Amino acid sequence: MVKKVVNTSGKRKTAVARATVQKGSGIVRINSTPVELYEPEIARWKIIEPLQIAGDHLDKVNIDVNVKGGGFMSQASAVRTAIAKGLLEYTGDPSLKIAFLDHDRSLLVSDSRRKEPKKPLGRGARRKRQKSYR
């Protein structure tokens, strides 16, 4: 018997999350920590969104996610994208895809925005020193 294992990834800024979805009993771990214990709480809420939308599909799978890079909210966004993609690929349910897209498109599509590089004569990408013509 061949085990069905699905590997997916999600990205946000410099955070990269890799999710492994396989047959199981509904356990979700992020960096070996159960999702119920993941801190900070606001990031946990963001991660739980695709799990709540999936509903009954979650009871038949275990999801292990490894995430690194970026800040805690970027990591949370990357994790939720990886989880949603993994569940969709594992189940192959078109109604689940519609539910994810209706809720939030970023569940299935990685956010491609990056930090704009700093330029000379200023403290940031756009801010410049004030000019005086007198």
Task: Annotate each predicted stretch with a short phrase.
Residues 73-80:
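Beta-rich strand-turn-strand
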Residues 2-9, 17-22, 26-68, 81-134:
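Structured, basic alpha/beta domains of bacterial-type, RNA-associated proteins
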